[in-house]
Amino acid sequence: MPDTSSDARLTAALRAGGHRVTAQRLVLHRVLQELGTHATAEEVLQAASPRLPGLSLPTVYASLDLLARLGVARRIDGAGAAALYDPRAEPHHHFACRSCGRVLDVDAEIDTGALASAARRGGLAVDGVDVTLRGLCPDCR
C-alpha cells in the first residue's frame, strides 16, 4: 500500500521545485521507501522494473538524484563505491563496515555546525555535512 503522506511530500517538493509529478518518480520513491535500506541505483532498478517495464539505469540515477536534491531522499557518496540512496531524508549519520561494505544509520546528535564552521575558517565552501563512522559491523567483528 503506498504511503500517501510520503507521496504528498514528494508531490509538494516536485511542484515547489518546478518539476513534473510523474508516475515514474512516485514509483521510484515508493520503491526506495519499500527497500528501507541504503540502496544503489541498480538495486532500485531491479526492484522497480516489474512496475515500470523498460526503465533504464540512467533514468533511475537521474530520478534518485532529483529526489536527493529535493530533500525527500539522501545520496551517500562513498570513496570508490557506487552511490547509495537513503530513504531517510531527515538528518542522521552513518556507519560503514570496512569488511562487508554495509552502511547503517547512526542516530546521534553531533554539532555539525561546528564542523562546517571549522572548514569555512580554512577557506572551504561547505555545501553540507555528512558524518560517516567506519569500522566493523556486528556481523563482521
What is the role of each PLM region?
Residues 26-31:
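Pre-recognition alpha-helix immediately N-terminal to the DNA-recognition helix
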Residues 69-141:
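Non-DNA-binding regulatory cores of transcription-related proteins
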